[in-house]
Structures are given as C-alpha cells and as structure tokens.
Amino acid sequence: MGREFIPLFEDWAATYDQTVQGLDIQYKEAFRGYDHILDAIVRKSGTHVLEFGPGTGNLTAKLLDAGKTVFGIEPSPAMRKLASDKLSGRTEIVDGDFLTFPEPPFQADTIVSSYAFHHLTDEEKRAAIKQYGKYLHLHDKIVFADTVFENAQAYQQAIDKARSQGFYQLANDLETEHYPTLDALKEMFTAEGFAVRFTQQNDFVWIMEAIKR
C-alpha cells in the first residue's frame, strides 16, 4: 500500500520543498511547472476534497486558499508534522494511505493526489480506484498528478536517459517504484465506471481527471 516507501519520505521530508523548487538537478524536469500543476488540480476540484499523500502540504494549502474543504491522508509522520506546521491548523492531516484511511468528516466530491499514486503496485492501484468508485457519487471525480509513461518503451527510455545523464538516483527510483502507463491507468479507471482523460504537464508528469459515470 505504498507504506514501504515511508522511510524514503522520512529522510526526504526536510528537503522536499527544495526539491519541488527544482534545486535537485536529477528531479528538476519531474517538478518543472510544479505550481502550475498544483493550480490545475485545484481548478479541476470540487468543494469538498479528500487528499492522499499531501506531503508537506503544498497542494493542501492551495486548495484551502481556494476556499475548499480538505481532509488529508499522509502515512509519513515527518511529512505530517511539516504539513501541520505549514497549514497552522487550517485542516487536519491524519495517518493513513491510499487504501487504509479514516473516513472523512464530510462526503468528498473530489479525491486528489500529487506525485504519490505510483507508490502503489498496479494491483493496489486497481483496488484503490475500485474503492473510490464505490465511495464517490455520480459526476464526482478523481484528480491525480503523477509520473506516467505513454508505454513500456517510453518508460525504459526514461531510465536509460537518466543513466546516460548520470542521474543514478532518478534511474533507481524509476526502476524500483511502480510507474504506470497511460493504457494501464485508462483500463483501471474505465473498469470502475470512470471516464478519464490525461493531460501531459512535462516529460514525466500527467494530470489524470476521472469522472464518475
């Protein structure tokens, strides 16, 4: 359920905001347009939002600034602490993950996440989408931004390119985490009654908007 990556985020928490600002050259392209990507998620979201993997609270803050009600689910204690400090009590960030989490204190009309869904295996992704499909009402939506590849060949090319650039940490991440392809995600969402569309944001990240039919 992605919890095997908690030690990574415990270590990364203190420097995560510097990374998303493009200060780590290996991840600069993945976070190119970061603020624009988060703003796009906010625009596509409804009024009551369930957020998975808020990390240090960057998307959460933008959602709250837009007047939305937010309930955050974050498995990393270090990330929860940073998010709580950043948000100054404006909303609650609780322990949980994409599959196991406390029930929100409201009925969410949108489920969002940024840079996190790839921590689930394909089987777990499918189970999560199924769970959300049962929870959401007609016309509610899922809006995720994450690294996705057009196909398996593009995935391998990204790994090879990272290695050729000397970006060995990035290459290792690409090889050990569970990055999906567009076709795989489309099949998962469609199987659970969602109409989904994908919009590319940079060489790595796509926004997926899935509307419950």
From Swiss-Prot:
GO BP terms: rRNA methylation
Write out the GO cellular component annotations.
cytosol
Q: What is its EC number?
A: 2.1.1.-
Question: Does the keyword section mention S-adenosyl-L-methionine?
Answer: yes
Q: What class of enzyme is it?
A: transferase
- Print the keywords alphabetically: Methyltransferase, S-adenosyl-L-methionine, Transferase
The species this protein was found in? Bacillus subtilis (strain 168)
* Similarity remark: Belongs to the methyltransferase superfamily. YrrT family.
Q: What is this protein called?
A: Uncharacterized methyltransferase YrrT
